[in-house]
Structures are given as structure tokens and as C-alpha cells.
């Protein structure tokens, strides 16, 4: 009842640890078998290694956290030689998150990493708010987003999903531009831009000044955006933003997501993903659903059916 079929991804269940909140899985593999996961979104990979932003770069908030990590990663060579081979021991498809500062960077990383035998899809990171160049610059302009998507699609050996930024005036317009450029799916949402101030100094707590807000605080925004975008495109969506339990997963499915990524909750409870997987069948049954597929987009498909009958 939990299996989901998406472009490039045959998922045993719809639960995926989100990129940036799971590293490359090594720490979590000491706690449970990663093969139970529907898929794994690995940490963003750039062409060259990145050390990220200066510290402090994480701050707790009332209902979540701010981060300004800055895409710290070992670079394409390190991921291809060390991380992906290590992940081959697990029976779960890998989604490689690709980031860069310019189109050529994305293209080179995508072309090479998509050929790794356990990478089943790419997640194009065009929405990171914590880097000075690239990242969110591509995610806030429909034409730039479409051009980058097409460039990556032209070289990728696997389906391409594009990660959407919530820090835009019209997320539907950007989603449609990306779909028109050939994207196979969308992941959404990335973090909202936020800030915390130190009351003693009056200065921002984060060295980067601003950071990406994640956690329960952003879930209503994420659900609303998934609900809107899923009605405007025909490609599948992997929803994310503030998921803490199986009820949250069901809410994203009803809004129109076909699978759900769990991010910040992994920092609070490292067992959260397997716990949600175990809990989900009972939650679906409690609300009268016999499968994940039956839930997808129910919130608006129900309205459309009622309107059609009227």
C-alpha cells in the first residue's frame, strides 16, 4: 500500500530523507538499515569541494531552525569516489542533489553524477538561499530556471527533478516554466529566508546574517504551495517542509505530493524516517485510505470532481 512509482524511482514507500539533513547517510546507517527508506536525497554536490559559510551558521528558532551552511561538500570527485560507492550496499535508489554557481558547473556535475550506477534521479538545487552566486539566483527567475533545467536535461542520464524556492512572488509560474523545459518532477519547498538577532549585541546570530528557515514553522506554507503547483503542472512533486510525523505526510499527499521528504526532524530524532514508515499504514487506514496513490491530490481532485458533477 505504500509503494509509489515516479520517473526513475520505484519507491517501496514515499518517505525520503531530504538533502542537507542526512549528509551522505553514514551517521544514520549506524542507527538503522537505510534500505528501509523509499529513497535517499544525498547532500548537495558541487564541482569543487566547498567548505561552506563561516560559523555560526545554525540557530534554533521557536518552531524550527535557521541554517546558513553554504553547501559544504567534498566536491564531485569525492562524492563519486567515496560516497556513492559506499551507498551501493543499500537497497534504495539515490537522488543526487546538484548545485553550482553557473550553468556550466551544473551541467558538468549532472553529466558525471547521473552515470553513477546507484543514482536514479537528480535533484537540481536552484533554490539555496545561503550562497552568494548561483543557487537561488536561478530559482527566482522563470527564464533562468527553464534554461538551466534544459541544459541539465540535455546531458543527464537519469530523470531530473528541480527544487523550488518559496522565496518568490509566483511559484506556479516558475514551476510551469521548469516543466516546459523538460523537468521530470519537482521537489518543494526549500527553506524560507529568515534572521535571528542577538539581543545583547543587536547583531544577527548567523555569520551570514540570514539563513534558511525550516521545520514545523514552514509546513503550512509548503502545503499551500504544493496544493497550488500540483494543480498547475502534470509532473510529480516530492513535497517537503516541516514534516514531523505520518499525519504530516498524509497532509502533503492530499495536497498533491506523490512522495514526501523529511528534513529538519532528522536532527531532533534520527529515527524519524523509519518511525514514520512504520506509522504511515495505520494513519492511512485511520482516515479511510488503502494506498498512497489513493491520497495524492485528493484535496483538489475532490473539488474538481464535485465541480464537474455540478
Curated annotation (Swiss-Prot):
Catalytic machinery residues: 128
List the signal peptide residues.
none
Reaction(s) catalyzed by this protein? Answer: (S)-dihydroorotate + NAD(+) = orotate + NADH + H(+)
Source organism:
Bacillus pumilus (strain SAFR-032)
Which BP terms from GO are recorded? Answer: 'de novo' pyrimidine nucleobase biosynthetic process; 'de novo' UMP biosynthetic process
Under the GO molecular function aspect, what terms does this record hold?
dihydroorotate dehydrogenase (NAD+) activity
User: Quaternary arrangement and interactors, per the entry?
Assistant: Heterotetramer of 2 PyrK and 2 PyrD type B subunits.
**Keyword annotations:** Cytoplasm, Flavoprotein, FMN, NAD, Oxidoreductase, Pyrimidine biosynthesis
Q: What is its EC number?
A: 1.3.1.14
Q: Does the keyword Repeat apply?
A: no
PROSITE patterns listed in its UniProt record = DHODEHASE_1, DHODEHASE_2
| Name assigned to this protein | Dihydroorotate dehydrogenase B (NAD(+)), catalytic subunit
EC class: oxidoreductase
Q: Name one Pfam family in it.
A: DHO_dh
Where is this protein found? Cytoplasm
Which residues are recorded as binding FMN? 19, 43-44, 97, 125, 163, 189, 215, 241-242, 263-264
Q: Tell me, in a sentence or two, what this protein's role is.
A: Catalyzes the conversion of dihydroorotate to orotate with NAD(+) as electron acceptor.
What pathway does the annotation place this protein in? Pyrimidine metabolism; UMP biosynthesis via de novo pathway; orotate from (S)-dihydroorotate (NAD(+) route): step 1/1
Please state the gene responsible for encoding this protein. pyrD
What the record notes about the co-factor is:
Binds 1 FMN per subunit.
Spell out the InterPro entries in the cross-references.
Answer: Aldolase_TIM, DHO_dehydrogenase, DHOD_1B, Dihydroorotate_DH_1, Dihydroorotate_DH_1_2, Dihydroorotate_DH_cat, Dihydroorotate_DH_CS, Dihydroorotate_DH_I
Family listed: Belongs to the dihydroorotate dehydrogenase family. Type 1 subfamily.
Residues that, per the record, bind substrate? 43, 67-71, 125, 190-191
Necessary cofactors: FMN
Q: Name one GO cellular component term.
A: cytoplasm
**Primary localization:** cytoplasm
PANTHER family listed in its UniProt record:
DIHYDROOROTATE DEHYDROGENASE (FUMARATE), DIHYDROOROTATE DEHYDROGENASE (QUINONE), MITOCHONDRIAL-RELATED
Amino acid at each position: 500500500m505504500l509503494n509509489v512509482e515516479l520517473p526513475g524511482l520505484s519507491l517501496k514507500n514515499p518517505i525520503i530523507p531530504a538533502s542537507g539533513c542526512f549528509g551522505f547517510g553514514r551517521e544514520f546507517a549506524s542507527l538503522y538499515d537505510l534500505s528501509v527508506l523509499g529513497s535517499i536525497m544525498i547532500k548537495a554536490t558541487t564541482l569543487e569541494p566547498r567548505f561552506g559559510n563561516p560559523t555560526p551558521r545554525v540557530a534554533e528558532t521557536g518552531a524550527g531552525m535557521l541554517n546558513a551552511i553554504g553547501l559544504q561538500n567534498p566536491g564531485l570527485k569525492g562524492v563519486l569516489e567515496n560516497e556513492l560507492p559506499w551507498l551501493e550496499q543499500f537497497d534504495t535508489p539515490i537522488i543526487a542533489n546538484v548545485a553550482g554557481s553557473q550553468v556550466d558547473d551544473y551541467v558538468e556535475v549532472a553529466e558525471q553524477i547521473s552515470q553513477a550506477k546507484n543514482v536514479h534521479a537528480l535533484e537540481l538545487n536552484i533554490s539555496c538561499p545561503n550562497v552568494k552566486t548561483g543557487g537561488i539566483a536561478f530559482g527566482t527567475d522563470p527564464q533562468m530556471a527553464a534554461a538551466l533545467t534544459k541544459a541539465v536535461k540535455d546531458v543527464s542520464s537519469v530523470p531530473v527533478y528541480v527544487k523550488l524556492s518559496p522565496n518568490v512572488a509566483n511559484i506556479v509560474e516558475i514551476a510551469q516554466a521548469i516543466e516546459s523545459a523538460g523537468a521530470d518532477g519537482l521537489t518543494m519547498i526549500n527553506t524560507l529566508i529568515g534572521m535571528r538577532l542577538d539581543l545583547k549585541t543587536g547583531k544577527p546570530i548567523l555569520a551570514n546574517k540570514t539563513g534558511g528557515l525550516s521545520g514545523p514553522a514552514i509546513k503550512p506554507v509548503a502545503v499551500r504551495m504544493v496544493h497550488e503547483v500540483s494543480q498547475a503542472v502534470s509532473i510529480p512533486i516530492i513535497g517537503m517542509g516541516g514534516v514531523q510525523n505520518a499525519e504530516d505526510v498524509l497532509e502533503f499527499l492530499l495536497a498533491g505530493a506523490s512522495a514526501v521528504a523529511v528534513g529538519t526532524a532528522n536532527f531532533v530524532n534520527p529515527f524519524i524516517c523509519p518511525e514514520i514508515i512504520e506509522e504511515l499504514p495505520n494513519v492511512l487506514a485511520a482516515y479511510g485510505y488503502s494506498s498512497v496513490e489513493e491520497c495524492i491530490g485528493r484535496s483538489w481532485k475532490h473539488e474538481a470532481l464535485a465541480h464537474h458533477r455540478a
